[in-house]
Amino acid sequence: MRRLFALILVICLSFSFAPPAKALGADLTPCAENPAFQALAKNARNTTADPQSGQKRFERYSQALCGPEGYPHLIVDGRLDRAGDFLIPSILFLYIAGWIGWVGRAYLQAIKKDSDTEQKEIQLDLGLALPIIATGFAWPAAAVKELLSGELTAKDSEITVSPR
């Protein structure tokens, strides 16, 4: 049985091979020079009330890199010349997600002291939540402060370990 399994494994591994990998962006060209992109730009539809919105959109896209199909591709390799494409929006996303998480955590800690905690989790107490939301923009500094003071992490004695 072991030999049969080994034989099947050898056959499967010998027939399963990965195609050669291409370098990131090797087949990408500037959209302004891409014929497929130019064909798409000629048929650009307006997406707003502005009659030139389609043309303006494709003018902005012409600064990007396009594949052979004519569509712009997002390069996410860490080069700073493309930071505006991905790096800045991703940092902004992480900041906003952290703000939401920090404010939610602070709200749950604030209502924990009340008697109707479950009700305040379902129906937000806006009188309590709005000041917390307003101060949430400084969450990175508050997180560092709580991390250094030990408030952010639980003590080892508070963490239960189940016996096995």
Curated annotation (Swiss-Prot):
One of its GO terms (biological process) is photosynthesis. Gene3D superfamilies: Photosystem I PsaF, reaction centre subunit III. Pfam families: PSI_PsaF (PF02507). One of its GO terms (cellular component) is photosystem I reaction center. It is found in: Cellular thylakoid membrane. Residues 1-23 form the signal peptide. Disulfide bonds: none annotated. It is a multi-pass membrane protein. Keywords: Membrane, Photosynthesis, Photosystem I, Signal, Thylakoid, Transmembrane, Transmembrane helix. The chain crosses the membrane at residues 83-103, 124-144. It comes from the Bacteria. Belongs to the PsaF family. Probably participates in efficiency of electron transfer from plastocyanin to P700 (or cytochrome c553 in algae and cyanobacteria). This plastocyanin-docking protein contributes to the specific association of plastocyanin to PSI. This is Photosystem I reaction center subunit III. It comes from Trichormus variabilis (strain ATCC 29413 / PCC 7937).
